[in-house]
Every structure is written in structure tokens, then in C-alpha cells.
Regions:
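Glycine/proline-enriched, intrinsically flexible loops and inter-domain linkers
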Residues: 1-177
Length: 178
């Protein structure tokens, strides 16, 4: 069946392959400009010493007093372009700090489905994971997936469309976020 329950989803991750649509529940904020990395480095507790183009990382944002504000996955798409993906609290904190600080950045939000004024996303996000994920990805791309360290971005083609794939897993099996 197309949809059953959480237990079947978990078993697919462990025994075959699961395909998740993550487009509906997380906002993406694109941060562009010469201060993009500096702004996110200021807001996140993570080190940015090894962060660069075609890399991603789990980012944790705290207030100046150390209280947790939010978290998400941060992608470096180009030297001066980042994308933050996650729940709304981190995006609100990012937007507030960009507005009140002296940062040379522009922000573009692609809100999750129910709050998106356009009624659709500009970018959709999916997770493919499980022991059979490499075979499925090879079938979709026509070639074995290139190997990359965890959280590195790969550029692949599926059905003639450019797709960015992040080597990533939630359950310890092979997986990619597309």
C-alpha cells in the first residue's frame, strides 16, 4: 500500500527502502550576501572552520544567554549562499537578527506547505533511506551513487532534472536527502 503506518515506515528503513516526503513540514530560508556565513556563524553554536560549498551541517541556534532557540540543517550552496531548513523558530531568529544587525544579507523564505502564500514550494525535499536505497538511487539516476562523506552534497540527475543529494541517514542505513 502507498501509506500504512509508522511501524511499516520504520521497518522499510531497516529492511528495504523508505521514501519520505519532507516538503510539507519544514521551512527553507535562503541567506545570500557577503555576510551570509558570518551571520549564521554568529547565530549558531557550531564551528564553521570546515564549512564550505557543497557541505551541510546540523546547526543549533542559541540566545546570547545560551537558551536554545532552534535547530535545522544548514546547506552551503555557494560561497555567499546558504539555505537553512528546519522548524519555524530558527527562521524567526535568523530573520530578526538579520533585520536588527548590520549584516549584508538578503533572505528569501520558502515556507512549509500550509503556510506558503504561493500554495506550493519552490524546492521540494525527500528522504530515501534503507538497505535497498543505493539500488533505488541507481535505478533513478542510471548510475551508482557517488560516495561522499556524511553531510556532503552531491549533484545528480534524475529524469533529466538537476537534484542536490545530501549523504545522510536517520536510522544508520544508506540514505540521501534529495
Amino acid at each position: 500500500p502507498e501509506f500504512t503506518n509508522w511501524r511499516d515506515e520504520q521497518m522499510a528503513c531497516r529492511e528495504s527502502v523508505a521514501f519520505y516526503d519532507q516538503s510539507f513540514h519544514m521551512t527553507t530560508t535562503f541567506v545570500r550576501g557577503k555576510d551570509a556565513v558570518a551571520l549564521l556563524s554568529h547565530l549558531c553554536v557550531n564551528s564553521f572552520s570546515t564549512f564550505g560549498v557543497d557541505r551541510s551541517r546540523h546547526s543549533v541556534m542559541c540566545s546570547p544567554d545560551g537558551y536554545l532557540i532552534g535547530d535545522g540543517i544548514l546547506y552551503c550552496l555557494a560561497e555567499d549562499e546558504l539555505a537553512l531548513v528546519g522548524r519555524q523558530a530558527g527562521h524567526n531568529w535568523l530573520r530578526y537578527n538579520a533585520a536588527v544587525g548590520d549584516w549584508d544579507v538578503s533572505l528569501e523564505e520558502d515556507e512549509f506547505m500550509s503556510d506558503n502564500p504561493n500554495g506550493r514550494r519552490s524546492m521540494y525535499r525527500f528522504q530515501v533511506e534503507g538497505p535497498h536505497a543505493p539500488a533505488l538511487m541507481e535505478q533513478l539516476t542510471g548510475a551508482p551513487m557517488p560516495t561522499a562523506p556524511k553531510l556532503h552534497l552531491l549533484h545528480i540527475t534524475i529524469a533529466g532534472h538537476h537534484v542536490t543529494a545530501m549523504q545522510h541517514t536517520m536510522a544508520g542505513n544508506p540514505g540521501w536527502e534529495l
